[in-house]
Design a protein with these regions (language model features):
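Conserved hydrolase catalytic core segment
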Residues: 117-156
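Active-site loop/oxyanion-hole signature of alpha/beta-hydrolase fold enzymes
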Residues: 33-38, 43-45, 67-74, 81-122, ...
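Alpha/beta-hydrolase fold catalytic core
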Residues: 1-51, 75-77, 116-117, 297-305
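Helix-rich cap/lid subdomain of alpha/beta-hydrolase
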Residues: 2-10, 150-214
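Active-site glycine-rich loops that stabilize anionic/oxyanionic intermediates
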Residues: 58-61, 125
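Catalytic active-site module of serine/aspartate enzymes centered on a nucleophile-bearing elbow/loop
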Residues: 271-305
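Short beta-strand element of the alpha/beta-hydrolase
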Residues: 50-58
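Conserved serine/cysteine hydrolase catalytic core
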Residues: 205-267, 273
Length: 305
């Protein structure tokens, strides 16, 4: 099928438009690694000799969700943004195995294969849950933790809004339909920013229609992972077991993570603190890239690394 011009803004142009400060030669390399029985794709930025920051995206997203953050940080840090199982260009899991333990196994195996240790672990939403549970269980590997708009308990209304959005956009006839519906869902983003994001998140089917790259089991009406009371209680226990310095980041306009739960999250983390980013919803790094970068930089500068 012929390649199409989908109207997305080139990364550096989009970053400048969003006010992101970066070095002009900052571009990622794309790699693959066999780990935990699957083939994982990742984007790598910066020098391997610098402190590694591992970035874990949210449900339905890809490693490119972190492009702005990686651009801003890669002059001082070695960034590895991972396509988690079932997402982006990584393998889908056999038998739809997307449990917390499976994700933890992935992170451990990827770090081992890439020779990474003493990391800063950063995760958004689903990736945030994977990050704080991993930090609790592998304390020797995680020097610092950044959890973005995520906690053991989320606001059901906001989570349901996201689920309706993805369920109603399983397969559409044109790329333009995805652009229009995404703009309605997140009016904070410009059309060109949305196009750039969708270029990385969608794939074209042989019949010419478009769909999401990630495993459709995530957008099944029956898919409600990690919401049972037992699992929520287990995750709060994990939060209390995180030993490293930790930052909780909430978008001021988030309908997914409440201010009350964000405050509880920061309080129950033994070395936790909270930052609220204005002009941002759930997808904080893309909604307000400069605001997100400011709170991350302030945190990293204030802790012993």
């Amino acid at each position: 099928m012929a390649e199409q011009d989908l109207g997305g803004m080139p990364l550096h142009e989009a970053a400048r438009a969003a006010g992101v400060q970066f070095h002009e030669d900052a571009i990622p390399s794309s790699g693959f690694v066999e780990a935990n029985g699957l083939r994982f794709h990742y984007l790598e930025w910066g020098k391997p000799t610098d402190r590694p920051i591992i970035m874990l995206h949210g449900m339905g997203q890809t490693a490119h969700s972190w492009d702005f953050a990686a651009l801003a940080l890669c002059d001082r840090y070695h960034i590895v943004a991972l396509d988690q199982r079932g997402h982006g260009d990584s393998d889908w899991a056999p038998n739809a195995e997307y449990s917390l333990s499976a994700h933890q196994g992935d992170i451990a195996a990827v770090l081992s294969e890439l020779g990474l240790d003493d990391i800063v672990l950063m995760g958004l939403s689903m990736g945030g849950r994977n990050a704080f549970t991993y930090a609790a269980d592998y304390p020797a590997q995680v020097a610092a933790l950044i959890v973005v708009d995520s906690a053991p308990e989320l606001q059901q209304s906001g989570a349901d809004t996201i689920r309706r959005f993805v369920e109603n956009m399983d397969v559409l006839d044109t790329f333009e339909e995805f652009v229009v519906k995404t703009k309605q869902y997140n009016p904070r983003r410009s059309d060109r920013q949305i196009r750039g994001s969708l270029t990385n998140n969608l794939k074209q089917l042989p019949d010419g229609r478009w769909t999401w790259k990630y495993d459709r089991v995530f957008r099944s009406p029956d898919a409600k992972p990690w919401t049972s009371p037992d699992i929520v209680a287990q995750m709060w226990h994990k939060v209390e077991g995180v030993q490293c310095h930790a930052l909780v980041v909430r978008g001021a306009g988030s309908t997914v993570l409440s201010q009350k739960t964000a405050e509880e999250m920061a309080q129950r983390l033994p070395n936790g603190r909270l930052a609220v980013v204005p002009d941002a919803g759930h997808l904080v790094p893309g909604d307000n890239p400069t605001g997100f970068h400011q709170v991350v930089e302030a945190f990293l500068a204030d802790i012993p690394l």
